A protein has these predicted regions:
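Non-catalytic interaction-recognition regions
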Residues: 1-91
Length: 91
């Protein structure tokens, strides 16, 4: 249970870093900072998805985890858009 919460909070923290990463990348003229961030975000999402079941969770937990998935998807799509990369809708 602690591991699940750690994965959830790690993903939330990574999502929250996005505005700072954009500012840093722009200030330093370093678009590779955004590629690193998108990779780290994908890793955080993978750990979350691997350790936090959604389908079999109770209704409240399921709803919050689905909202976190949507936040990660939106964040990754926005970062990729800044890099002029089109994010796939389905994998």
């Amino acid at each position: 249970d602690v591991y699940k919460r750690q994965a959830e909070f790690a993903l939330i923290r990574k999502i929250a870093e996005m505005p700072e990463m954009i500012n840093t990348a722009a200030k330093d003229y370093d678009p590779s900072a955004l590629t690193r961030y998108s990779y780290e975000l994908a890793q955080a999402f993978h750990k979350f998805y691997d350790s936090c079941p959604i389908k079999d969770a109770d209704a409240d937990v399921k709803q919050s985890r689905l909202a976190l998935c949507e936040a990660a998807r939106t964040t990754l799509r926005n970062v990729l858009s800044l890099l002029k990369v089109e994010a796939p809708e389905r994998m």
